[in-house]
Amino acid sequence: MPVSLLRALLVFSLLCLGLSATRAAHAAMEIEVVGGAANKIAIAMVPFQTAAGQPSPPLTQIVADDLARSGQFSMTDVTGAAQPVEPSQVDYAAWRTKGAEAMVIGQVVALGGGRFEVRFRLLDVVKGTQLAGYSYKITAAQWRATGHRIADVVYEKLTGIPGAFSSRIAYVQKQGKRYELRVADADGQNPRTIVRSLEPLISPMFSPDGTRLAYVSFEDKKPVVYVQSLQQGGRRKVAAFKGSNSAPAWSPDGRQLAVVLTRDGASQIYLINVDGSGLTRLMRSGDIDTEPVFSPDGQTLYFTSDRGGSPQIYRVAKSGGDAKRVSFEGSYNVSPTISPDGRYLAYISRDGGRFRVVLQELASGQTRVLTETTRDEAPSFAPNGQAVLYATVQGGRGVLGTVTLDGKTRARLSESGVDAREPAWGP
């Protein structure tokens, strides 16, 4: 049986999560940009001004890190430069000399009672005009969220594509013998634990509206699919049938899950309502079918199967019928995920013993290797489709990373001393 397909039977996931025990750590995740695309937008991030004696919030660094991680921007050196607060104070010619094409200026005003007003302006340095200006009233607990919000505005105004910096990721962290399902900001910061267990937790996936997580838990001494509310905290067993229940995938309308069951012996894909009713088998075969994912329009499912003799990616209509092979390069392709616009698949491909993230354009079938690591798994697209989140292994432990679609900008979300696996990118 191919190793990848054992994931459907959950042995693969147990092996992935069962690395050597590590000590708990609370260090912030670190971002390392290791490459970059051509034609980046040169942007100057002028430090946000604060009143004398007032601590400087981390807004400037949060926005700069977000933009750098996107691969679309280069940071103009602001050392020794004037630090304007209003557009009327900006010497555009001087900033053009420094190579800046755009700049962000702003200030933080203390309102009292633990509240602040954050004002910022996005300026076109080349034309000498203002592109955007906003003011937010926040508490001290909202610095990071506000920084991500500003980065989203900057990204969209300068690229025409919505930003995804205010989105969230989910992942499983192993600390010693404990497993934690966590949700964090898209940069890995502000993690909070959703579920704790002494048994493995795997395969988290956000609902389309971001209010729920589907995942698999072994707490009943068998794999069971749960759906958990991120707002109220309650959860429901959705699939707890005889045998293995695994690989939940949301339909775009949030009403159904595709799940993989072995209730009839073989690993097969079923559709089930989120309340656990309406179980329907998608196909009937003696092959191992697993890792389903819906197309954005909800009419097609992509999945992994060994029906051709080796694990490959296939697609089938939601109404059933014959499956058609999608991946053709290489003898081992697993774990498909589809971009929000339906143009691309990302999946894990094995090449000479290396497991790496590959991007495939569905219309042409052309592929591109996105990563240089060798033990990648669980790719997941950003909500704006401009990057892929994945897990890999470095130094004997699981770490999370992101990579842009051109493969030139890769970032590590590496929290010291823990194993982080099974990532999913949500709204």
Swiss-Prot record:
Listed GO biological process terms: cell division; protein import
Main location: periplasm
Keyword flag Signal: yes
Cellular location(s): Periplasm
Pfam families linked to this entry: PD40, TolB_N
Entry annotated with the keyword Signal: yes
Signal peptide bounds: 1-27
One GO CC term, this protein: periplasmic space
Keywords: Cell cycle, Cell division, Periplasm, Signal
InterPro entries per record: 6-blade_b-propeller_TolB-like, PD40, Tol-Pal_TolB, TolB_N
TM helices/strands, residue ranges: none
Family to which this protein belongs: Belongs to the TolB family.
UniProt function note: Part of the Tol-Pal system, which plays a role in outer membrane invagination during cell division and is important for maintaining outer membrane integrity.
NCBIfam families cross-referenced by the UniProt entry: propeller_TolB
Quaternary organization: The Tol-Pal system is composed of five core proteins: the inner membrane proteins TolA, TolQ and TolR, the periplasmic protein TolB and the outer membrane protein Pal. They form a network linking the inner and outer membranes and the peptidoglycan layer.
Protein name: Tol-Pal system protein TolB
Source species: Thiobacillus denitrificans (strain ATCC 25259 / T1)
